[in-house]
Amino acid sequence: MKQAASLGVVVLAGLMLSGGLALAQDDASVPEPSGTDAAVEVKAASYVEQTTIGDMFEVESSELALRKSGNPQVRAFAQHMIADHATSSHELKQALSAAKVDAPVPTALDGEHQELLNTLQASTGADFDRNYLKMQMDGHQKALQTQVDYRLHGGNKELQDFATKATTMVQTHLSELGKISQGALLSQ
């Protein structure tokens, strides 16, 4: 008898709880579920924007390094960044086309990256090299997170495949940065 009474209390509590939840969720407060394609496109659009702006910054800041740096290690790294990130941008556009996702591709830096570029333009000598290498390290760490996040959680296979390849590239750049940062800064 005690078990039946206990079961009755549990069932009653469950009904009250579910009834309370049902009352709390009227039709006006429950958002309509968005389509899977829309959710994927939003995520893909954000990924494409972050990756494209990152590539543009790497190329533009590295072109500046070729003009302003006198350090051969910094200049060699900058040349490598221009080549790799130009290739990355091209491959991203190909993946985006294959993915058939309508995601706008930025054509200019955002405000944050333009400010960083302005800081570099105002720098000279050893300060330029330090700023450039620090910005490269910071930018590549952010890029790595972006690539890994999309590779693991993105909703489009073509873009995930690109993110996998880009992850390897960014990891290589971070490794190179670790090596040349020490040498470049110690030799000044």
Please describe what each predicted stretch is.
Residues 2-11, 18-188:
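His/Met- and acidic-residue-enriched segments that coordinate or traffic transition-metal cofactors
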